Structures are given as structure tokens and as C-alpha cells.
């Protein structure tokens, strides 16, 4: 089994957390994000106060209100969730480019080759959790393990707002006690069948030969045999092509005016240029942009086609972006849109320069 360092990051009740962050009046009471009970709406997610009443994701809103009559259901704001997800992924990319998103609020990271914290996946996960909390004011749970299967289980082990680590030396003992219902790919039907066969834990499952499991479960029996031993060779796939590269910084003290923001630009641009220099040649930097998040979490992005990537161009963009809010700033970001050259052919100039 190859020794890798995989982190699974899962935001805690993500949609609900964003809503409670943006409207503190929602915190401390049962609330959910979902559709109207009058129109066969469904709960997308809910906070932990609502879960105490038995409310769950994918439950009909009508049934959720029967369980919890005081439940407040708010309409989803997907653009706000997408923006928060983009900010989280910006943090991820400081540590690795091997990121496999599973949804807006969940992703695998392969940090096997990361140089951060001398390659300590545990310290990287701790830093990610700290930065997300400081930057977005929401919590995430994380699991660290030698493979995806175990990392995902680990992230759920100490939810919410927890971190759990399974080291290579702990895999055999940890997996042996694991209920087979927790295995990746085991649904209710398979779990019921395993129970009828007297298989409750992975230790029981190890008593079955590979051939016997294949006879009983078909091709999935091969995977069951491996999972019972903590084996999962699936790679972290980063199939999506990037549309931009950027750096952001959340300041401990709000920047009070434009002059304070402009003073931070040189350091941000230096970090951006370092990141651009590490990119492969299949990307071409294009439009520059600036992002400003004000102290009240409102934000704006300003970009301009044809503008340069020099300090003065970014100063002008920042000035225009700041003018849209004119309030103290908690976060500044600078970046550039990318042209994806992979598989594309650059058009030759009709009259090349002499």
C-alpha cells in the first residue's frame, strides 16, 4: 500500500453556516436552508439545533416542520455559497494543486508532496481549519489518513469543528473495529446483506476470502476485500481546469481607507507573481482583477480586459473597487483570469511583426 497524505475537508452545515454568519439573528435557534413546505420543498441542510429535533438533509420541508414547529426555513443563496467555496479553495491551493472537489463544501487534498510544515499533513489540516475560521467565520472538520476512504471517515469522526488523524501505523487496528456500514460504497441493501451473513465489522469481513466475497457480491466483493484491510488506491483527481489564479489576505484589523489598502498591494502582487511563475505553460494570464471584502462581508470584484499586470493597473482597479463600498476592508485579493491553451491552437498573426 502506497503511503500518501490525504486530507478530507468537510464544512459543518455549510449553507446554514453561511446564513447564520450573514444574519446573526439566525444563530442559536433551529434553522434550515431549503424550499417552501407549501411547494413540496426539501431541506438542503440545517444547523445543529435543528438536527437535535431529527431534521435532516433531503427531508421534505413539510415533515421537518412537523418534527420542529419552530424551524425557520430560509431560501438558498447559491451564489453566496459558491463564493464562500471559491474562497476556501483559494486557501487549499496554498498547500497543494491536487484538489478534488466533491461538492461546494467538501474536497479531498493530496498533500503528499507539500513542503508546508515540513510535510506534516496534520499541521496543514490544522492551518486550513484555522484560516477558514478566521477568513470566512465558519467551521470545517478535517480528516487525515493515508487514503481517501479513511480520510473521509476521519473527517466525520469528530464533527463538528473537529480534526481526526489516522496514521499508517493505526490503519489496521482502526479499520478492524470499523462497522461495515461505514465502508465506501456500502449502501443499505449491501449493509443488510452483510448483516445477514454475520458480518458486522471489518474484522469479520477479513475472515472471508477474496474469492468468497466476489462470489457473494460480484465485482464489489474485490473492493470489499481491500477496504476491510484499509486499502484504497484511488488517486485525488484534479480534472477541472483553472479559470483564474489569485491570492487573498484577511487582515486582523480592518483597513480603514483606500490608502491603507493601496499600501498592501505590493506584497499581494509579489505573492501572485510567485504563484503565476509556478503554473504550467498550458495557461496564459489574461485579465487582471481585484477583490475587496468590506467589514460587513459585502464584497465586490473589479476586472478590466486589456489592462496590464503592473502595480499601477492594480492600483486603479483597487481604487474603483473601494469606491463601490467606501467602508473599512477586511479582505483584499488580487488575481488574473486565465486562458486555457490546452488542446487549443493559438491563431497565427496575419502580419507578424518584422
Curated annotation (Swiss-Prot):
Pfam families: IMS, IMS_C, IMS_HHH_1. Binds 2 magnesium ions per subunit. Its EC number is 2.7.7.7. Its main location: cytoplasm. Keywords: Cytoplasm, DNA damage, DNA repair, DNA replication, DNA-binding, DNA-directed DNA polymerase, Magnesium, Metal-binding, Mutator protein, Nucleotidyltransferase, Transferase. Its cofactor is Mg(2+). The active site is at 106. Disulfide bonds: none annotated. It is found in: Cytoplasm. GO terms for cellular component: cytosol. It catalyses: DNA(n) + a 2'-deoxyribonucleoside 5'-triphosphate = DNA(n+1) + diphosphate. PANTHER family: DNA POLYMERASE KAPPA, DNA REPAIR POLYMERASE UMUC / TRANSFERASE FAMILY MEMBER. Belongs to the DNA polymerase type-Y family. This is DNA polymerase IV. It comes from Pseudomonas putida (strain ATCC 700007 / DSM 6899 / JCM 31910 / BCRC 17059 / LMG 24140 / F1).
Amino acid at each position: 500500500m502506497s503511503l500518501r497524505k490525504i486530507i478530507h475537508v468537510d464544512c459543518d452545515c455549510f449553507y446554514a453556516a453561511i446564513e447564520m454568519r450573514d444574519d446573526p439573528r439566525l444563530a442559536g435557534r433551529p434553522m434550515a436552508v431549503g424550499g417552501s413546505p407549501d411547494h413540496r420543498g426539501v431541506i438542503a441542510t440545517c444547523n445543529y439545533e435543528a438536527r437535535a429535533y431529527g431534521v435532516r438533509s433531503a427531508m421534505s420541508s413539510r415533515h421537518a416542520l412537523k418534527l420542529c414547529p419552530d424551524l425557520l426555513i430560509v431560501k438558498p443563496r447559491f451564489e453566496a455559497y459558491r463564493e464562500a467555496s471559491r474562497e476556501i479553495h483559494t486557501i487549499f491551493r496554498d498547500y497543494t494543486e491536487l484538489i478534488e472537489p466533491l461538492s461546494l463544501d467538501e474536497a479531498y487534498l493530496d498533500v503528499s508532496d507539500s513542503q508546508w510544515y515540513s510535510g506534516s499533513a496534520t499541521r496543514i489540516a490544522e492551518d486550513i481549519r484555522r484560516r477558514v475560521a478566521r477568513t470566512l467565520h465558519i467551521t470545517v472538520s478535517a480528516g487525515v489518513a493515508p487514503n481517501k476512504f479513511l480520510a473521509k471517515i476521519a473527517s466525520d469522526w469528530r464533527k463538528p469543528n473537529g480534526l481526526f488523524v489516522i496514521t499508517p501505523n493505526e490503519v489496521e487496528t482502526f479499520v478492524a473495529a470499523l462497522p461495515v456500514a461505514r465502508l465506501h460504497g456500502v449502501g443499505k441493501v449491501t449493509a443488510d446483506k452483510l448483516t445477514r451473513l454475520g458480518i458486522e465489522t471489518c474484522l469479520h469481513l477479513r475472515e472471508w476470502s477474496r474469492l468468497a466475497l466476489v462470489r457473494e457480491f460480484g465485482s464489489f466483493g474485490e473492493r470489499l476485500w481491500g477496504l476491510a484491510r484499509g486499502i484504497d488506491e484511488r488517486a485525488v483527481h484534479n480534472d477541472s481546469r483553472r479559470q483564474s489564479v489569485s491570492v487573498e489576505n484577511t487582515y486582523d484589523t480592518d483597513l480603514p481607507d483606500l490608502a491603507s489598502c493601496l499600501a498592501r498591494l505590493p506584497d499581494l502582487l509579489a505573492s501572485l507573481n510567485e504563484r503565476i511563475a509556478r503554473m504550467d505553460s498550458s495557461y496564459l494570464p489574461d485579465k487582471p482583477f481585484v477583490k475587496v471584502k468590506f467589514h460587513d462581508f459585502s464584497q465586490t470584484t473589479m476586472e478590466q480586459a486589456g489592462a496590464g499586470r503592473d502595480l499601477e493597473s492594480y492600483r486603479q482597479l483597487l481604487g474603483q473597487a473601494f469606491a463601490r463600498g467606501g467602508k473599512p476592508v477586511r479582505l483584499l485579493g488580487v488575481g488574473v483570469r486565465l486562458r486555457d491553451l490546452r488542446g487549443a491552437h493559438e491563431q497565427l498573426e496575419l502580419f507578424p511583426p518584422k
